[in-house]
Curated annotation (Swiss-Prot):
Protein name: Low affinity immunoglobulin gamma Fc region receptor III-A
Signal peptide: 1-23
Entry PTM: N-glycosylated. Phosphorylated following receptor ligation.
A Pfam family of this chain: Ig_3
Species in which this protein is naturally found: Cricetulus griseus (Chinese hamster)
Length: 275
């Protein structure tokens, strides 16, 4: 076996080994601490990357909105959150694939209705809501409202737990409470509870019916158009222009009659009385 053949075989083995390792890698996982995906400005948030590291290499790649950051630790600390920190975060280790994105929202206000995930839930999922105040200022007489109606009241601020979500829990939520002597309310958060399975590759029946109707109307219109065109061509082919025969007899007859009348008038004018 030649040196080139041996080298080529070794390279192929390395490539196969690398491909096999990449195929066997698991995704890294990003978690939030605290768990809330919605926070207020100046809150402290820690993102943790859970993945596999090779011996002696604990470096981590962090991406914010797709751009590589300077952070290389497994823990990504945001000491005082700002609006610019909002967005998607992903991480990757040497022996882990790129994680799924985790979305962080940073808001400005006195109160914020917090959730532990984006506000779309499956039926049966638990839902946790928290009426969070800026810089953890004490809040009293807290009311959680759904579609403008009071759902739960707490004299002292507490989380609202929905153990098994149903479609009846879908709607617009917000919270309000007393901070100092002032009544404050959070922004409205739309929560959806439903079937999150992959949608069918077939369009809904009403879309199918609409498309069939449009196709039928187009076909009828096309047939009528060509029928009319064919009828017009046939009518044109069957039409014969009538022959026109011109005769000079009436004209000649008129001229002769005028000559005869002129002669008669002349003869009458030459009477003896006029001579």
């Amino acid at each position: 076996m030649s040196v080139w053949t041996s080298r080529k075989a070794a390279e192929d083995n390395d490539t196969s080994l690398s491909s096999g390792i990449r195929a066997g890698l698991q995704k890294a996982v990003v978690t939030l601490h605290p768990e809330w995906v919605r926070v207020l400005q100046d809150d402290s948030v820690t993102l943790r990357c859970q993945g596999t590291y090779p011996p002696g290499d604990n470096s981590t790649k962090w991406f914010h909105n797709g751009s590589l950051t300077l952070q290389q630790d497994a823990n990504y600390l945001i000491g005082s959150a700002k609006v610019k920190d909002s967005g998607e975060y992903t991480c990757q280790t040497a022996l882990s694939m790129l994680s799924d994105p985790v979305n962080l929202e940073v808001h400005i206000g006195w109160l914020l209705l917090q959730t532990t995930q984006r506000p779309v839930f499956r039926e049966g999922d638990p839902i946790r809501l928290n009426c969070h105040s800026w810089r953890n200022t004490p809040v009293y007489k807290v009311t959680y409202l759904q579609n403008g109606k009071g759902k739960k009241y707490f004299h002292k601020n507490s989380e609202l737990h929905i153990p098994n979500a149903t479609q009846n829990h879908s709607g617009s939520y917000f919270c309000r409470g007393i901070i100092g002597r002032n009544n404050k309310s959070s922004e409205t958060l739309r929560i959806t509870v439903g079937d999150l399975t992959s949608p069918s590759t077939f369009p809904p029946w009403h879309q199918i019916t609409f498309c069939l109707l449009i196709g039928l109307l187009f076909t009828i219109d096309t047939v009528m158009y060509f029928s009319v065109q064919k009828g017009l061509r046939r009518s044109t082919a069957d039409y014969e222009e009538p022959e026109v025969h011109w005769s000079k007899e009436p004209e000649n007859k008129t001229i002769s009659e005028e000559k005869q009348s002129f002669r008669s008038s002349r003869a009458n004018s030459e009477t003896p009385e006029n001579r």
